């Protein structure tokens, strides 16, 4: 049973990212609830990469590239904007960005939940493999490129090339779609889809009407090579 | 990697603080490129009769006075020119009304070690190899005033690390360009431009992009037309940030793999490779923040 809160403050003004990450890599599996606050991230790269801990982590400020990459279990909140590849290859747990995210948010994520409260840039959810992503704002071009599994909810608009070469992941978009990628198509929303969007918006704590979302999924025409199609190179 | 920064100030009071505001942007991006650093500053626009010639030598104890005395003897009084100059270690700004072609030739003959980095009525260019933070201190970027600037921190991935290979690149007058990325057809562009009689100073890919775009502008294209042509002719990865005496302009290639983020308020437009270098700017929390789209032209007037 979880006992007393173990609150720890780490300050990147006095410690290196490597020192902070080494602290975060210790064995937290002691039955206690852990709360860790990281101060002065100042856009440093690779903060909190490789976490595998039942812990709540608040990063107070802007983070750089790869923050919370490969996350397991931990619930990480970044109180600012993040650079490229936040929560890249996330396995489980959750990562929440209070501001905007740059390119490749949650790239190749296997599980867990990634919430971007602001906008995400291009290639959001590229090659996602089971992670759930909720973006409060809009996403940039080529989001969901080769997305294999998992769900992505976009409350704003999506730029060109959405879901290009998508496999079995599903994308839900409330706003305008500025062009679908190859083999991505709009499909009717089923009751299960509305339930999925409702559940994900609840988890993300974002208020939107689930009925307004469109479903984008694979037309599966790229699954097999079609020699009859006219090829020009 | 490389770092690029740009800042355009929309209000007069802020223009007194151009250097002060850009220095943290620039030094932050030194982490993306530690080979070389440089910045082009644009002072108050307006039609000055004088051209500003920015000169560079690698020797920090260079006897500028002798050179400039000779220049005065040669040019003072000609074409109504009233030659003035200011020097700062291995950099000098010479103000004169003479023809840039004649001036360039004179310097080449007088001392080939002296490199004419830029010509323009509003633009000063400072660049060198070495730690960008040191370059920034040596050339007193913090004291700069003016309407806009573009800077670059370089981590070379193709041509040599020398002062002339560092950014910003300039071509023509009052035009400069910084680049993050790499072009795959710079020699094709270069051969094309050399047939037009355009001379190159380095074997660097960015110089090809810089001279190509300036050539299109000089041939009468507006910015839109010049850059639309550039999209079809430049092959490779690029985020390009350009400046003229009255605007800055930003474009990314079709894949937009090279980073750029823009923060715009009523008071300024700030551009950087990474958001963290904009985080100190006043009112940035309320700024409109976005990443530019591929092959879209973003241009801001002073």
List the model feature ranges, each with a label.
Chain B
Residues 1-302:
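Conserved short alpha-helical segments that host acidic/polar catalytic motifs at enzyme active sites
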């Amino acid at each position: 049973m979880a006992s007393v809160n173990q609150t720890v403050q780490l300050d990147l003004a006095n410690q290196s990212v490597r020192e902070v990450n080494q602290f975060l890599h210790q064995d937290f599996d002691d039955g206690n609830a852990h709360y860790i606050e990281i101060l002065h991230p100042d856009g440093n790269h690779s903060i909190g990469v490789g976490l595998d801990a039942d812990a709540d982590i608040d990063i107070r400020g802007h983070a750089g590239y790869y923050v919370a990459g490969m996350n397991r279990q931990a619930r990480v909140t970044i109180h600012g904007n993040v650079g490229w590849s936040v929560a890249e290859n996330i396995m489980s747990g959750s990562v929440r960005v209070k501001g905007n995210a740059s390119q490749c948010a949650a790239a190749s994520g296997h599980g867990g939940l990634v919430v971007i409260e602001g906008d995400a840039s291009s290639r959001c959810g590229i090659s996602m493999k089971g992670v759930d992503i909720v973006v409060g704002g809009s996403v940039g071009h080529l989001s969901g490129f080769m997305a294999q599994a998992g769900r992505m909810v976009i409350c704003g608009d999506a730029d060109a090339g959405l879901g290009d070469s998508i496999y079995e992941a599903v994308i839900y978009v409330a706003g305008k779609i500025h062009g679908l990628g190859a083999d991505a198509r709009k499909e009717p929303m089923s009751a299960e889809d509305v339930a999925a969007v409702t559940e994900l918006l609840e988890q993300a704590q974002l208020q939107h009407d689930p009925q307004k979302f469109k479903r984008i999924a694979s037309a599966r025409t790229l699954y097999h090579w079609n020699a009859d199609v006219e090829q020009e190179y | 990697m490389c770092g690029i920064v740009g800042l355009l100030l929309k209000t007069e009071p802020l223009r007194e603080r151009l250097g002060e505001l850009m220095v943290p942007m620039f030094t932050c991006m030194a982490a993306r490129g530690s080979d070389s650093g440089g910045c082009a500053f644009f002072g108050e626009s307006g039609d000055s009769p004088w051209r500003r010639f920015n000169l560079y030598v690698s020797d920090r104890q260079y006897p500028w006075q002798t050179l400039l005395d000779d220049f005065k003897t040669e040019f003072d009084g000609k074409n109504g020119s009233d030659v003035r100059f200011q020097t700062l270690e291995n950099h000098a700004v010479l103000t004169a009304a003479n023809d840039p072609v004649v001036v360039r030739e004179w310097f080449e003959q007088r001392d080939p070690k002296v490199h004419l980095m830029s010509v323009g009525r509003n633009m000063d260019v400072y660049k060198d190899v070495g730690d960008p933070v040191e370059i920034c201190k040596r050339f007193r970027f913090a004291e700069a005033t003016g309407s806009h600037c573009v800077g670059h921190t370089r981590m070379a991935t193709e041509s040599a690390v020398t002062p002339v290979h560092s950014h910003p690149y300039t071509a023509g007058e009052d035009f400069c360009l910084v680049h993050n990325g790499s072009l795959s057809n710079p020699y094709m562009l270069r051969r094309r431009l050399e047939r037009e009689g355009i001379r190159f100073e380095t074997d660097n890919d960015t110089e090809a992009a810089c001279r190509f775009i300036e050539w299109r502008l000089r041939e009468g294209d507006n910015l839109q037309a010049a850059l639309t042509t550039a999209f079809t002719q430049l092959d490779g990865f690029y985020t390009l940030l350009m400046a003229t005496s009255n605007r800055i302009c930003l474009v990314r290639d079709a894949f937009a793999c090279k980073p750029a983020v823009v923060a715009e308020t009523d008071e300024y437009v700030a551009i950087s490779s990474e958001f963290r270098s904009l985080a100190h700017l006043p009112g940035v929390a309320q700024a409109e923040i976005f990443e530019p789209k591929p092959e879209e032209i973003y241009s801001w007037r002073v």
